[in-house]
């Protein structure tokens, strides 16, 4: 295991890894007191390299690492990649390409929903992971050998896991299924945190469309404040306070003092004026610019039994193909399919349609039936 703290060592390591067919990647980060995660360690492993990069080392330039992430000749292998990629998007404007996420691949290969790394280490690599350093403050220096070994284990076993899963995907001809999922993880929009959409994260009641307009603006205000000041959203203003502001709609800074969820003394802060400006923007928002909040569409009468049949079909198809149900469809998808033959849901697109969606539509049209044979539930072709 090599600990990299200098630009020269990082360039040399990335040059070596650039000739490998794949490199396994993981990170350790902290975001307890910040909006943006603080990148504390980067773990990398190639066929003959085991490296830990210290991003907190003085004057270390991570450009060679980000160039490696974009090197199309090297597959970047992660387990549950989303948070790692979010960091790379923010820090280095780099999205790994090509990308392989072993958690997604494992769900396609029959290991259940959101399978954990430790499970794959045990089942595919015949190893075990020491969890005793899991709650380490990774921003502290120096780190102990035990902590570094714990971090390194997140990528060393990953090499074997990747090789096993890649072979299974080739054998089952499902590599393109995983590729479709990787396209979502590689889409920059997956990681966009736009202030104008922040209201969707806030669970709040509001009075009519005008209250919603105020919520849109004050949630955007909080998002900008959190990003610019690098503070957790809750440290700027809690959801309860945003909800109360959207309900009560204060008109002056002093009105904020009468809201229970707004921190005492906030009206005297430098942020109070900008918050009230956000309230005013909400009050002035044109009717046509206020978002339309649509609740779940009521199911057509009598459609419940069809939804239940689709649940059974989903279970049958996922067990038959050894794929996690969660990856194929959820209840909301099934309800939409039951109500609309060409519903805009993932289960009717790409490999999901191939595995489940087409049969779901055939079941709905009466071309496929579900029956019982002995102790087994079976699918029966009809003559319609």
Swiss-Prot record:
The keyword Iron does not apply. Keywords: Cytoplasm, Exonuclease, Hydrolase, Nuclease, tRNA processing. GO terms for cellular component: cytoplasm. Residues 208-289 form the HRDC domain. Pfam families: DNA_pol_A_exo1 (PF01612), HRDC (PF00570). Residues 1-170 form the 3'-5' exonuclease domain. NCBIfam families: rnd. Belongs to the RNase D family. This is Ribonuclease D. The gene is rnd.
